[in-house]
Regions:
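Bacterial N-terminal signal peptides that target proteins for export
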Residues: 1-2
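N-terminal signal peptide c-region/cleavage motif recognized by signal peptidases
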Residues: 10-13
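Catalytic glycan-binding domains that act on GlcNAc-containing polysaccharides
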Residues: 15-159
Length: 159
């Protein structure tokens, strides 16, 4: 019931996208929905059109605006709710930049990347760090942010 409440809350708060993307990705990969929500909160603030071009964040108001920005960006671009790096992961999944703007697909790809990172590291939280960066000093700060967000998600869900 708590998951349903949070998903309804998100669907009304998050630019109208269907928040069940997180639940579907969780079911498909085994990654806890709460962890996916926490990562998305840290990565994009639940903004489905969030784009980061070479370290510079943008929050386009519309998909149209986001597509224009993506056309002008190079390969080093993070896209969508889960800030999937297109230069690295786009080719591995055979996806275009515009495809990664789809919230359902973006969250699923992010969950699959996290699943890969968890397997590679052997730990949930090491996997979270690896999701962000292969460099350990960047991982620690990121894991702390996600941990705080994760606790917030759990609080909102009443668990």
């Amino acid at each position: 019931m708590a998951v349903v409440f949070l998903l309804v809350f998100l669907s009304t708060e998050c630019w109208g996208f269907s928040a069940d993307a997180f639940l579907r990705a969780s079911v498909a990969t085994g990654i806890p929905v709460e962890l996916l929500l926490a990562i998305s909160h840290v990565e994009s603030g639940f903004h489905p059109h969030a784009i980061n071009v070479s370290g510079r964040p943008f929050l386009p108001y519309s998909e149209y605006e986001a597509l224009g920005l993506l056309k002008r960006s190079g390969d080093n671009v993070d896209i969508g709710l889960m800030q999937v790096n297109w230069g690295y992961w786009g080719n591995k999944f055979g996806l275009s930049k515009s495809e990664l703007l789809d919230p359902q697909l973006n969250v699923l790809v992010g969950a699959k990347i996290l699943e890969h990172c968890v397997r590679a590291s052997g730990s949930w939280w090491k996997g979270v760090g690896l999701y962000h960066s292969p460099e350990s000093f960047r991982q620690r700060a990121y894991v702390e942010k996600v941990w705080r967000s994760y606790r917030l998600v759990l609080t909102k869900m009443g668990t």
